[in-house]
């Protein structure tokens, strides 16, 4: 995988340009460490949401990227719109793991348990609905 090309995330315009460029070039797989770093960066919702939408196209997700997307799904301090986008992204990534010949070290059953726990905890119906809609992908991932 390539080194992190995104530089200073406070200069979000430049980071967004690089995101759009690697999306167009279809090289997202090669930039997963940088994408995970953007997901850890809490000070720009546009970057986070863009990455969450773009990672759905990653064919061989790294454990670090899966973990960061799961962290957003689970984080009670993040607004629900981003968490719902993260649920969809996680479902796509888990589905892509099924077709990945390389075995990820991340425990997929642990992800399933965390997702199930969200369904029985108090959250808005729209969040539960997004989880249920995507749960088949988690269960089969």
Language-model features: where?
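Amphipathic alpha-helical scaffolding segments comprising HEAT/armadillo-like alpha-solenoid repeats
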Residues: 2-3, 26-39, 60-74, 96-117, ...
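Structural signature of alpha-helical solenoid repeat scaffolds
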Residues: 20-23, 55-56, 91-95, 135-136
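Eukaryotic acidic, Ser/Thr-rich intrinsically disordered low-complexity regions
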Residues: 112-141
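Residue-level detector of extended alpha-helical repeat arrays and alpha-solenoid scaffolds
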Residues: 11-15, 48, 83, 124-128
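Amphipathic protein-protein interaction modules
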Residues: 74-102
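N-terminal alpha-helical scaffold/docking segments in eukaryotic complex subunits
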Residues: 1-34, 47
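Short inter-helical turns and helix N-cap capping residues of alpha-solenoid HEAT/ARM repeat scaffolds
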Residues: 8-11, 43-44, 77-79, 123-124
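Conserved hydrophobic register position within alpha-solenoid helical repeats
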Residues: 18-21, 51, 86, 130-131, ...
């Amino acid at each position: 995988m390539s080194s992190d090309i995104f530089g200073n995330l406070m200069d979000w315009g430049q980071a967004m340009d690089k995101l759009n460029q690697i999306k167009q070039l279809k090289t997202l797989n090669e930039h997963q460490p940088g994408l995970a770093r953007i997901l850890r960066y809490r000070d720009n919702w546009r970057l986070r949401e863009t990455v969450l939408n773009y990672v759905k196209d990653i064919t061989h997700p790294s454990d670090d990227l899966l973990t960061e997307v799961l962290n957003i799904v689970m984080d009670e301090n993040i607004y629900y719109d981003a968490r719902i986008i993260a649920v969809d992204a996680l479902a796509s990534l888990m589905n892509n793991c099924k077709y990945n010949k390389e075995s990820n070290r991340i425990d997929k059953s642990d992800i399933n348990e965390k997702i199930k726990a969200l369904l029985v905890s108090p959250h808005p119906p729209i969040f539960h609905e997004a989880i249920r809609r995507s749960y088949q992908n988690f269960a089969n991932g």
